A protein has these predicted regions:
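N-terminal presequence-like segments and adjacent domain-start helices
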Residues: 154-179
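Divalent-cation
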Residues: 65
Length: 192
């Protein structure tokens, strides 16, 4: 399975967070909303954390999103991965992928970096630049994407869990997000 921002938004809606589309419509508005409304920020962060935990507990999933690494620290059946690349290369990739000017692509990358860092810091007190929080760090400026995928697959199939080690499978998660995750992945299976 694969879960990203769009998945998180659907799950948030299923869990009763109707303001989620407005939060996710604009990157700037998303964070403005968090800083202006502390209670709403706390509620959204708590539900996002619950969704990440429920998704990880479901198993056999790749999670892509801001701060997913934070609540999944220390679990032997989880690989926290940081994929990075030099800023000029990231800007070039965004220019090509989204057909943006260099100036707009630069602004996009810088804003996204700031948002990811702010979310991890304000939600978990962590920095995504602290590479000790990751089990594997891949620089796609040096390693091509096919090799990176092979490494990730090999790492995922080589996990070592010892008896008594904490696992995502053993997490205690809230029932509402757990049911929403199961429903989402069942829906996707039917679409295949």
């Amino acid at each position: 399975h694969f879960a990203d921002y769009a998945t998180a938004e659907r799950l948030m809606l299923q869990c009763g967070f109707q303001q989620t589309p407005q939060v996710y419509d604009s990157v700037s508005d998303f964070w403005d909303r968090f800083t202006r409304r502390g209670m709403e920020r706390d509620q959204i962060n708590a539900m996002l954390r619950s969704i990440v935990l429920a998704t990880a507990q479901h198993g056999d999933v790749v999670l892509l999103g801001r701060g997913c690494f934070a609540p999944l620290q220390g679990l032997c059946d989880v690989i926290n991965v940081r994929v990075k690349a030099p800023l000029p290369l990231r800007i070039e990739r965004v220019m090509e992928e989204h057909d943006l000017s260099k100036q707009r692509a630069t602004r996009f990358v810088e804003e996204k970096d700031a948002l990811v860092a702010d979310f991890a810091r304000t939600s978990y007190g962590l920095s995504p630049d602290d590479l000790t929080l990751f089990d594997l760090v891949i620089d796609t400026g040096k390693i091509d994407s096919d090799a990176a995928v092979r490494w990730l697959v090999e790492a995922a199939t080589s996990l070592v869990c010892r008896p008594g080690d904490p696992t995502a499978a053993a997490l205690k998660v809230a029932q509402v997000p757990k049911r929403a995750v199961a429903k989402e992945f069942t829906r996707r299976e039917r679409l295949r």
